Regions:
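Sec-dependent bacterial lipoprotein signal peptides
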Residues: 1-13
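Short, well-ordered, aromatic-rich surface patches in folded extracellular/luminal domains
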Residues: 16-23, 27-29, 77-136
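Post-signal peptide N-terminal segment of mature Sec-exported envelope proteins
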Residues: 22-43
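Residue-level detector of buried hydrophobic side-chain packing
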Residues: 41, 65, 92-94
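A short, sequence-level motif marking secondary-structure junctions
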Residues: 42-45, 61-62, 105-112
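Acidic/histidine-rich, surface-exposed loop or edge segments in extracytoplasmic proteins
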Residues: 42-53, 101
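Mature extracytoplasmic domains of secretory-pathway proteins
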Residues: 53-84
Length: 136
């Protein structure tokens, strides 16, 4: 009887569509057409752009997303916010389990991970989610 209960519990857990934890959510804003974007990326490589349908990242993109998230753990835990310089076009807000990060495309002293995040967001928005190029 105990074995049947265990098997039943395993079946229910497997059929319930267990949701993978989110790696991060990014909100991009700016003063050009198409700048506004919300992107949610989960641990299994599923991405949603602007609450659209679930899309699948490639394996290299999943690795890139995880690397970016890991590299931003410390800045997020410190709730790092880098001010924009005059002439900024795009701003980014990232939230993950560790905290938040804010920066703009021209914020001075950006760590490499922030520049990688901006590139990742652009590439995934256009290549995976099929969104038009911002400013177009």
């Amino acid at each position: 009887m105990a074995g049947l209960l265990l098997c039943g519990a395993l079946l229910i857990g497997g059929c319930g569509g267990v949701l993978s934890p989110d790696l991060f959510i990014v909100q991009r804003s700016g003063n050009v057409p198409g700048a506004k974007l919300t992107m949610l990326v989960n641990e299994e490589g599923v991405v949603h752009c602007d609450n659209g349908p679930a899309r699948r990242l490639s394996d290299p993109q999943i690795i890139e997303a995880r690397t970016i998230q890991e590299d931003l753990e410390e800045p997020a835990a410190k709730h790092e916010s880098l001010p924009a310089k005059p002439g900024s076009v795009l701003s980014y807000y990232l939230r993950d389990a560790n905290g938040t990060v804010r920066f703009s495309d021209n914020s001075p002293h950006q760590p490499t991970a922030m520049r990688k995040l901006a590139g990742f967001v652009l590439n995934v928005a256009q290549g995976v989610c099929g969104l038009p190029q911002q400013g177009a």
